[in-house]
Amino acid sequence: MTPGRRSALLSRSVCGAIVLAVLVTVSGCASLPDSSTPQAIGTINRDSPGSSVAAPAPGREPDLLLRDFFKASTDPSNRHLAARQFLTPGVSGRWDDAASATIVDKVDVLPETRSADQATYTIRANKVGQLEPGGLYVAEEGSFETKISLELQGGEWRISELPAGVILDRAQFLNTYQRKSLYFLDPAGTTVVPDPRWVSGAQDQMASQLIGLLIDGPKAALAPAVRNELGDGVSVRGPITKADGRTAQVGVGLGGIRIDFAGVPPMDAQAKQLFAAQVIWTLANAEISGPYVLLADGEPFDERFPNGWTTADVASMNPFATSSATVGLHALREGSMVSVTETGVTPVPGYFGSARNMRSLALSQDGKLVAAVADTGRPAPEPASSLMVGAYEDGAASVLEGGAITRPTWAPDNSAIWAAVNGNTVIRVLREPGTGRTSVVNVDAGAVTALGATITELRLSRDGVRAALIVDGKVYLAIVTQMPGGEYALTNPRAVAIGLGSPALSLDWSTSDTIVVARAASDIPVVQVAVDGSRMDALPSRNLTAPVVAVDASTTTEFVADSRAVFQLNNNDPAGDRYWREVPGLTGVKAIPVLPG
């Protein structure tokens, strides 16, 4: 290990959930360097999965043959043909590989019975997820156990009895499958929203797979909250090719891509822009480069782009764009709001810069409005907290009071503020743009409050379609759904930071498909979590002093507050130079970083 880098051994509850450069083996935990960059759990294999899976090795002992079978099961091509080679002919014909796909780690193969030509083994493992149709990863936690029997046929062991469905070893799964996002539209049609999927196959098959999934539409939980311009009978005519019509190495390297759609209804220029944005960002973020030549029934999809589109043509809907670069970093310092620059801090004009009793605050996406939770100073049983709302450089008004109010969070269009009050009620504060008048309406959060007693954090994603929450120290993601009557609900909450090991203290959105979580642990206090719960990566802990009590993030930078200062972590720094740096003016004082959102 290089100087200046120490290893932190993960607790048993976290091992297998937080993984960096070194994979967790089936028998133990990995040692994590503090200053390494986040890595995917596993190395993406760009080759076709089938090319790396061999036929059963001759003379293999039954327990080793089972491990080879699990490895082969990660190749789904031809109805898991690679795995069927390990079965007896009769069982191969009956095996229902499509029944389920269970993802496990720490697989133990334990002998049950053994004779000269028969053997039965108990398979025990930690269950970490399910892979559902359409490549949907569902994070789960629990134990897995099943029995598999083998018999000797022609001098070779083959599986003679096994459960329906496939068992996927996590490390092998992550070597074979790739996580890619489909992009749908937010309700207002202002940005694209990710829907992560896990796909398998060579890179030259990727475009066809992703466009097919995009046409099939969003997952059921997300469907009420997004739009899909590729629905209603849209299909692809003929093969997807390179931009010049070549059919080899499509989506690999340069040369662009050409897709001819059928069934596209009449569209105005704006609808065509949205349609193209879905296609382009889905392909671009899967490392399939343009130009993107889009056709409809053999003719240019949009006459403005006969030679193809580029990401610049749909840049306004870039899912990785951030407003924080223009608004800048702010902080809550000793109860007051300050603007932060490279040279220091400056109190902002108006109420928010002069008040000394604020506990948390949030800036609107455009930086023009502020919402803050202030200490009322009144003794119990009077409300201890007040939600204050006002313009950035102006006064503020109290819109509601409560015993406890979470850090506010702004809707993307700056029209509403969300917060949880007293741990079990979620509200929206609506603000009229012209008059500044406010009204408070409840959000249907029954699906969330059923998960636990107390909501301590609520953060809306920058596209406004998801909400990240901490409930009783656990991390959940819910879908923000507008109901037919106009009211809002938090629906389909799912635990995503399974195996976190310590209670979550704070969280924020880094990208539209990644959140950053501060947890109550000294060894690895900050982690990144994928929205589908498929991965959890440790961020460096060098220079941090636990506990980390607050986190705010953008697509380029994470900010945290520990027990003595505010620190920043630049995602663009080289791996060897990536560590937390103190923010000038926010050292040795009680301060919390604040970015728009």
Swiss-Prot record:
GO terms for cellular component: plasma membrane. It is found in: Cell membrane. Residues 1-28 form the signal peptide. Residues 38-58 are annotated as: Disordered. Its main location: membrane. It comes from the Bacteria. A lipid is attached at residue 29 (N-palmitoyl cysteine). Keywords: Cell membrane, Lipoprotein, Membrane, Palmitate, Signal. It is a lipid-anchor. InterPro entries: GerMN (IPR019606), Lipoprotein_LpqB (IPR023959), Lipoprotein_LpqB_C (IPR018910), Quino_amine_DH_bsu (IPR011044). Residues 38-51 have a biased composition (Polar residues). Pfam families: Germane, Gmad1. A lipid is attached at residue 29 (S-diacylglycerol cysteine). This is Lipoprotein LpqB. The gene is lpqB.
